[in-house]
């Protein structure tokens, strides 16, 4: 073990030599290798390799964008962008674009302001114009109806009188002459209708001898009533109430003719006294209507005559 081979001794010697050589070369201050010397790169600022390989300078260059943001707030680039980011400048600045673009919000009130004035005029004028006419029309129509109702109270068939004349209230108003004339015209229309109906019965055939006689007499009587009513309307419609003598004479004639028409209606029905068939009921239905209207018309004529006589 204490004995080494020559080969081992040789290897050990070489190793020791190499170690010594390496140690001496690293500790030598006179080494001229510029690439391994740390002092020249840091001390020489003008050397290109240290500047390009220096790790400290690249970071400031790459981080330089972070430093500019603080200074720019006072610079113009941020002041030009401040309107879009900062809401206070647009509101404070009257010449800024946003307020002028929002200014249309004020025109709507201006455009709506004209719409508020129109409502007051229409509401006031239509109501003021319609209220007098509607109230006047309602009052006038009610007055006319009251006049007809009061006038019909003197008739024998009050309901028939009012129902037949009330549709003509606006024409009659409070005029007793028009009231009498319209009453006569309604009576004449009913008499013509009854005369036509009775004539159709006589032409129908199938009647008994008594029915034929009664129908023929009735046709004649109603015909006379129609004539009397027509004469009465003609005279009453053109009467001059200012001439009292003429007025009294005409009114006397009218009263006589209308009374005769009423008598004719009664005579018509008297002819069916011996008839017990349905024909009598049919004729009676029409003739009775004429007789009642004639009776009412005669009462209104008498009222008109007495009113004018008292006035004279």
Swiss-Prot record:
Disruption phenotype: No visible phenotype under normal growth conditions, but mutant plants have enhanced susceptibility to infection by the necrotrophic pathogen Botrytis cinerea. Induction: Induced in leaves during infection by Botrytis cinerea. Residues 24-141 are annotated as: Disordered. GO terms for molecular function: pectinesterase inhibitor activity. Residues 1-25 form the signal peptide. GO terms for cellular component: apoplast. Disulfide bonds join 152-161, 218-268. Residues 56-75, 105-124 have a biased composition (Pro residues). GO terms for biological process: plant-type cell wall organization or biogenesis. It is found in: Secreted, Extracellular space, Apoplast. Glycans are attached at residues 141, 153, 185, 200. Keywords: Apoplast, Disulfide bond, Glycoprotein, Secreted, Signal. Pfam families: PMEI. It comes from the Eukaryota. Residues 24-36, 44-55, 76-85, 93-104, 125-137 have a biased composition (Low complexity). Gene3D superfamilies: Invertase/pectin methylesterase inhibitor family protein (1.20.140.40). SMART domains: PMEI (SM00856). Its main location: secreted. Pectin methylesterase (PME) inhibitor involved in the maintenance of cell wall integrity in response to necrotrophic pathogens. Modulates PME activity and pectin methylesterification during infection by Botrytis cinerea and contributes to resistance against the pathogen. Belongs to the PMEI family. PANTHER family: PECTINESTERASE INHIBITOR 10 (PTHR31080:SF118), PECTINESTERASE INHIBITOR-LIKE (PTHR31080). This is Pectinesterase inhibitor 10. The gene is PMEI10.
């Amino acid at each position: 073990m204490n004995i080494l081979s020559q080969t081992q001794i040789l290897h050990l010697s070489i190793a020791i030599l190499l170690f010594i050589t390496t140690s001496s070369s690293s500790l030598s201050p006179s080494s001229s290798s510029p690439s391994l010397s740390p002092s020249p790169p840091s001390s020489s600022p003008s050397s290109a390799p240290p500047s390009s390989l220096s790790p400290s300078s690249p970071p400031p260059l790459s981080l330089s964008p972070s430093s500019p943001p603080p200074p720019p707030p006072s610079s113009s680039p941020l002041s030009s962008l401040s309107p879009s980011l900062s809401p206070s400048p647009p509101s404070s600045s009257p010449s800024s674009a946003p307020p002028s673009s929002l200014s249309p919000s004020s025109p709507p009130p201006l455009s709506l302001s004209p719409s508020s004035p129109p409502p007051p005029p229409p509401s006031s004028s239509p109501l003021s114009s319609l209220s007098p006419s509607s109230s006047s029309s309602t009052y006038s129509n009610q007055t006319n109806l009251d006049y007809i109702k009061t006038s019909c109270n003197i008739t024998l068939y009050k309901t028939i009188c009012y129902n037949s004349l009330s549709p003509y209230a606006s024409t009659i108003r409070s005029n007793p002459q028009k009231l009498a004339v319209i009453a006569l015209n309604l009576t004449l229309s009913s008499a013509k209708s009854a005369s036509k109906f009775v004539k159709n019965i006589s032409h129908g055939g199938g009647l008994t001898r008594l029915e034929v006689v009664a129908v023929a007499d009735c046709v004649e009587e109603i015909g006379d009533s129609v004539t009397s009513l027509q004469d009465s309307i003609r005279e009453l419609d053109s009467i001059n109430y200012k001439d009292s003598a003429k007025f009294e004479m005409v009114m006397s004639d009218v009263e006589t003719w209308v009374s005769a028409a009423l008598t004719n209606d009664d005579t018509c029905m008297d002819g069916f006294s011996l008839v017990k068939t349905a024909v009598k009921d049919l004729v009676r239905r029409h003739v009775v209507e004429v007789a009642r209207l004639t009776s009412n018309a005669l009462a209104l004529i008498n009222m008109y005559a007495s009113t004018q006589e008292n006035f004279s």
